[in-house]
Amino acid sequence: IQPARRHTKNTNMAKHTTKGTGHSMFISPRKIAHIPQINCEKQKLVLEVRSIYNDSWRVRGVLPFMINDFINQLNLTGKYRFGPVVYYQINIKEIPPLIYDVIRMEASKGYLWLDERNLDTHSLIGVYKCRVPMDLLVLKGLSNVILTTVNKAQPNISKFKDLKAMHYAFLNRQENVVKVVSIDLSDCMDYIPTSRILTSQKFTKQYGLYYNLVEWIIDLPIYDFHNHSFFPSTGITPIGEITHVILHNFYQNTVDSLLESWYPGITYSRYGHELFILCKQTDEFTIDDCDIDNILEVLDLYSVDINWSSDGLLMADNNDKALILHEDGSLEVWNSEDI
């Protein structure tokens, strides 16, 4: 395995302009019951919010009258005003392991955003969550609607987490692989201008409501619980699943689109910020370090971790999984605990 490296901004790198055609993993629209065209997008969002509401949301503090208030606000103003996101900084050495497990589980379900990037050096985690429980329900509904109608996910995909199984299943059945490059885009969200993220969503007039809601969401104020003050986010406001969906849409319309255009027939898979590019014996092109740097430079993405493997393994899923490349060119995905 070649040593990991980090792509940083380089203003002198030449830009590649090759054009072409490619393919996308997510092309089939989810089947949704016919809804009258008038206020169609409002109806879809309301139906989704109602469909995911159950007793667990009541326990979280969301009562039926709150849903009615949300619907009335949506119908009267065409908007919904979200409250601020609350930020907690926690030293994991000071909390019981059970509480930490609950936080990680909540993050995996998209109910909050867990930042563990400083864990190795400071044992600190950052937790971002909605202050208002009803906001979280609306965001979950909006996430599902954007993913299934705007992003046009496959029929068996109803929420962002469903893409994870597809991602690893796709990688697990690949053959004739010569080498694999792993690209971690997680730090990009800290500096990509929210205006660029919003423009990349490519919402048509048909989805004007979703555009307005996303515009509000990506710049939500963050309240620091310990310091009792607000602070601005340097990029998109991290919340939970809706953040993943917005960033997925951004990467789909930038990274995925460019890869398919420059390298027709390229084999790759991306789940959120985790991107794997597979170089195969049958490829009519080659990809090396310079090509990866060129791609990232053209996309203006930096602070990106890059790892190559020609005959070994690559870690995935926050080190919970590993990709093993065998000598015969087959690729397997293992749970880290089984290696």
From Swiss-Prot:
Task: Mark out the compositionally biased spans (Polar residues).
Answer: 10-21
> Where is this gene product found?
Mitochondrion
**What UniProt keywords are attached to this protein's entry?**
Mitochondrion, Plasmid
The annotated region (Disordered) lies at: 1-24
Q: Which domain of life is it from?
A: Eukaryota
GO cellular component, alphabetical, reads: mitochondrion
What does the miscellaneous comment read? These complexes consist of double-stranded linear DNAs with proteins covalently attached to the 5'-termini.
Protein name (record): Uncharacterized 39 kDa protein in mitochondrial S-1 and S-2 DNA
Species of provenance: Zea mays (Maize)
Q: What is the lineage of its organism?
A: Eukaryota, Viridiplantae, Streptophyta, Embryophyta, Tracheophyta
